Amino acid sequence: MKSLFTALVPLLPLATALPLVSSESPNAQPKSLYPFSSSGSNAKVAGRLFNIDGKVEYFAGTNAWWLAHLSSNSDVDLSFSQMAATGYKIVRVWGFGDANTPPPSTNTDPNLVYFQILNSTGSYINYGADGLQRLDYVVHAASKYGLKLVLNFVNNWGDYGGIAAYTNAFNCSSTSFYTDATCQKVYKNYVKTIVTRYRSSTAIFAWELGNEPRCNGCETSVLTNWASDISSYIKSLDSNHMVTLGDEGWFAPADGIGDGSYAYGGAEGIDWVANLKIKTLDYGVFHLYPNSWGYNYTWGNEWIEQHDKAGKAVGKPVILEEYGTPFPYNHIETEGPWQATVLKSGIAADQIWQFGPNGTSVSAEVFGDVNTIYFKTPEYATLGTGHAKAMSKKKV
């Protein structure tokens, strides 16, 4: 979703003492301090479902964008242990942390860690203790708790850099980013850095091109062509893991779905059906925030059913990857019906936005938002643990 957090604020000049390596040289990466597990098996498509470690089933997952932006290993472990106890199978984590200059050293979690510096001279990867060592630990630890990760490479929104960091450095725009030669070269270098670093790990569920990519006012072919190009590139680097787009699921008029209003009009440059047909995208995702899009909450059930039907027509799995409502500690009335609709549908999985741990050294409310469901709260027993159990028990 469009995060409520402030992006990393560039205030300091680039420090040459920092452990930065040009993204032009991904083969020169320093080795991780933490081993990546190759035990078990890589997740893969099984019809309209997924095979995870030899088991084909429906399941629930969650989002924890902040996980690799925590400085404490114990906080990561605690969060993973609570997700595993819930019955979640996958967790979506930001695989990006972009800035134009390093954040102030006085920053605290989750605004201290950054993975990439972008400026007019190029892109530089931070392999230090406040950089990819944090993502290294997340990938390492996920295996210990039997969880698999969805890692994305860039944010449509300005939080934690995103496309705005590329536009600031290389003078592309939020729409030309997808076709600009320089921006795409740097983006692909970052993709290569992350994919080649973690491709041996069975903890990776899927690579994701971006968080909620949009190209407002563009022909939908712009993003479809970009998604085809980047997913093919990822497959050339790693043919063993799945790839997905990370979009909100907008339909276009050509799809013949819906009433032609905002979610169906293609104004954000997305044609969900056309993108789902891309051979190098293994499954489709969609998000659900009616309050942000001008729809009522009951419409969410229709949105779920429409994506299920379209996914069935194409023959690929579909995940409701994000959903939330702005009612802190009071989400059951609005989100419970959506979960019931998912249970009745052929949707393979859903991932609520978002998970809030209990007991971390940094208060979970620091990186939580109005949509967060917090572990051990009354609503969590229903929307978290209860729903995960119901999904896993659903007959295949």
Region locations from a protein language model:
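Residue-level detector of intrinsically disordered/flexible regions characterized by low predicted structural confidence
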Residues: 4, 94, 395-396
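Short, basic/low-complexity N-terminal boundary segments at the transition from targeting/disordered tails
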Residues: 17-40
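Active-site mouth of glycoside hydrolases
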Residues: 36-317, 323-383
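C-terminal helix/juxtamembrane-tail motif
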Residues: 387-396
